[in-house]
Amino acid sequence: MTKTLIVNAHPDFRNAAHYSVQLEQAFLQLFQTRFPNDTVDVLNLYDTVIPQATVPELLGIWEKQAQHVNLSIEEQRLFAINQQLLQQFKAHHRIVIAMPLHNFNVPARLKDYIDNILVARETFRYTENGSVGLMTDNYRVMLLQASGSIYTRNDRYTPMEFSRLYLDKMFTEIMGFDRFEIVRAQGLQTNGVAVSQALKQAKMDLKAAFERFYD
């Protein structure tokens, strides 16, 4: 069975009232129905230490390693966490990201997580013709996104929704994933949009995406 990892990027991930959390639960229900004897691993980013790409943390650690300088005890601890996150990510061929849209982009902790898994010689490599993905063995990613506005009307909001483009390109173009899926619960704070109908549509879209995800 292909292993599945859910990465929950909501800061208030324990609150079931949040729409991205509801999408995550809908995904889990579909999974349990389809694969009753299997389990899903869940990583709650806001309940986990995620090293940051700063000089005191990852940037400083990588610089010391390049210069063959011993790491401090705290740096060793952070690097061990980094390696655990990276190996966990690589071990799962199905990645599901549940997140709200924050200021047209990904939540801050999700960006920190990407910095831990987007690693040269691990998930991609450099060549004379540019970077090449190493995650090419039937890896797929699904984004479960909740947003207050609607971003699929080809209006002024559409080009401002950076999260989908960023995640799609990082996973497929840089790391080499075979497929990127997005399921949107959108317009949840937009006048004239019925939240119940938006969620119903999102769950219908999720069901179809789920079938493609595990085909």
From Swiss-Prot:
Keywords: Flavoprotein, FMN, NAD, Oxidoreductase. Its EC number is 1.6.5.-, 1.7.1.17. One of its GO terms (molecular function) is electron transfer activity. It is an enzyme of class 1 (oxidoreductase). InterPro entries: Flavodoxin_fold (IPR003680), Flavoprotein-like_sf (IPR029039), FMN-dep_NADH:Q_OxRdtase_AzoR1 (IPR050104), NADH:quinone_OxRdtase_FMN_depd (IPR023048). Its cofactor is FMN. It holds the Pfam family Flavodoxin_2. Transmembrane segments: none annotated. Homodimer. Belongs to the azoreductase type 1 family. Quinone reductase that provides resistance to thiol-specific stress caused by electrophilic quinones. Also exhibits azoreductase activity. Catalyzes the reductive cleavage of the azo bond in aromatic azo compounds to the corresponding amines. This is FMN-dependent NADH:quinone oxidoreductase 1.
